[in-house]
Every structure is written in C-alpha cells, then in structure tokens.
Amino acid sequence: MSAQILDGKAIAAELREQVRKQVEARVERGGRRPGLAVVLVGADPASTVYVGKKRQACEQLGMHSSAHELPAETTQDELLALVDELNGRDEIDGILVQLPLPDHIDEQTVIDRIHPDKDVDGFHPVNMGRLTLRLPGLRPCTPNGVMTMLAHAGIELEGKDAVIIGQSNIVGRPMAMELLNARCTITICHSRTRNLADRVRAADIVVAAVGRPGFVPGDWIKPGAVVIDVGINRLESGKLTGDVDFAAARELAGWITPVPGGVGPMTVATLMANTLAAAEARDSRA
C-alpha cells in the first residue's frame, strides 16, 4: 500500500486563484486593493526567503504589499511604534511581523500590539480565543491551511482520533482546536509525553510539528492514517525534509503530505485569503 499524496502546492494554487478572482472583482466594484504590511527585523536567511514569498504572492494576486525591513538592533519600542503606525493606516488591512524576532524583543508583546482585525497571522489572543470558542475570526494560517487541504481531499474527520506532536502557539495548539472543532478526539503530545510511539500508532490523524528531521519513524504510523508533516528542516546537504520519515510512512499511511510541497504552500495561500478577509471585514464595519 502506498499513501495518496496531499498535494499542498496544487491545492494552494487553486486557493490563490480564488483569492485573485475575488480581489479582481472587488477592484472592479470600485473597492480598494487589500494591503499587507510585512515587517522583518534582522536578516535571518530563512525569514528573508519567507518574506519574499509572501510579498511575491501579494503582487501575483493583485494585492498591495509594503515591506518594512529593520536592522537586527531595532529596539522593542521602535518595533512597537511601527506596529502602532501600521494599525492606523487605512490602506493596510493586514500586518505580519515575521517570526522569530531577535532575542531582545518579546514576541508576544509585539503580537499583542497588532490590532486583532489586522492580525492576518491569527496569533493575537483575541483571534486565538475566537478559534477556541468556535467564533468567526482570523485563524492561524498553517492549521487553517491544513484544514483546507483535508476538506479538499474529502477526508472525513468527525469521530477520528488525532494526535498532534508539538504544542507551539503557532501550530500545535491552534491545530488541536481546529481538529477539535471538526469533532475529532485530540491528543497533544510534547517533550514530556510518555509512550509517544504508542499514542501515534493509535492515531487516525497524525500532525507532526516539532522541527526535528525524521522524528516520526514510518513504523509509528497506523495503516490508513492521515499524516500531516508540518516540519520544514534543512539538512547539511541543503535538502529540505520534514519531521516524518516520508518514504517509510508512505508505505503505511492512507494520505500523507510531502516536504516540500505539502503544508508550506498552504500557509502562504491562507495568509493571502486572510488578508482579503480582513479587508472585506473592515469594509463591512465602515
């Protein structure tokens, strides 16, 4: 048995095209192009690549983007002042501060400063709370993108046992809430979890988000399980790989995401969808 591939690249292309058409229709109605401000502090190579991809996506979909590249020595107060300015600018619908930030800046303080209506990453406590309470809001991009992928493939979630490996605020926790809202029974695993292999082997859905290459061996996967690999790890050879042993897991899983080409493209496409949604929501409140 060989798993079916959840082709995030193809599904993301469909989502991006939907967003592009909606932006085009919005402009034809006399509306303003959605605007995304992207803030980068320092010159971390991976962050620089991600920011470039997000800006490129904006341009391809007919959105306005503004880049704010700050030196690594930027103070927290200076960054907060920029966020305040962007919060007040009418042409900006979404604000994205690329993480991680330099050690001298507290990430949560910065996230909290972004207005919830412009928090297109979905990390603000207000938006996290709305997700938890099953209320409409801007949802974290990676978990939201995963849910879009699963829906596109027609994968039934209700009643399934889901294991999420990793408890980060960016992926693990909101992913658990997304799956809980879909009526899965969820287990969140972390560095103190006992009998991790047994828990994973019992799961119908496995989400790996720990940032360690090959952390999940193929023989941990239950036959027919859905495997979502959120990890993006660069080996010394330069090759990108996920948190799951893809070749071995593919022989047992029913569905599996590749790395690259799985979850990553969905994250960027969902960010674009969130930016459009933020613009539409702001218009409805005007």
From Swiss-Prot:
NCBIfam families: PRK10792.1, PRK14186.1, PRK14188.1. Coiled coil: none annotated. GO terms for molecular function: methenyltetrahydrofolate cyclohydrolase activity; methylenetetrahydrofolate dehydrogenase (NADP+) activity. InterPro entries: Aminoacid_DH-like_N_sf, NAD(P)-bd_dom_sf, THF_DH/CycHdrlase, THF_DH/CycHdrlase_cat_dom, THF_DH/CycHdrlase_CS, THF_DH/CycHdrlase_NAD-bd_dom. Keywords: Amino-acid biosynthesis, Histidine biosynthesis, Hydrolase, Methionine biosynthesis, Multifunctional enzyme, NADP, One-carbon metabolism, Oxidoreductase, Purine biosynthesis. It holds the Pfam family THF_DHG_CYH_C. Pathway: One-carbon metabolism; tetrahydrofolate interconversion. This is Bifunctional protein FolD. It catalyses: (6R)-5,10-methylene-5,6,7,8-tetrahydrofolate + NADP(+) = (6R)-5,10-methenyltetrahydrofolate + NADPH; (6R)-5,10-methenyltetrahydrofolate + H2O = (6R)-10-formyltetrahydrofolate + H(+). GO terms for cellular component: cytosol. Belongs to the tetrahydrofolate dehydrogenase/cyclohydrolase family. Catalyzes the oxidation of 5,10-methylenetetrahydrofolate to 5,10-methenyltetrahydrofolate and then the hydrolysis of 5,10-methenyltetrahydrofolate to 10-formyltetrahydrofolate. PROSITE patterns: THF_DHG_CYH_2. Its EC number is 1.5.1.5, 3.5.4.9. GO terms for biological process: L-histidine biosynthetic process; methionine biosynthetic process; purine nucleotide biosynthetic process; tetrahydrofolate interconversion. NADP(+) binds at residues 166-168, 191, 232. It comes from Alkalilimnicola ehrlichii (strain ATCC BAA-1101 / DSM 17681 / MLHE-1). Disulfide bonds: none annotated. Homodimer.
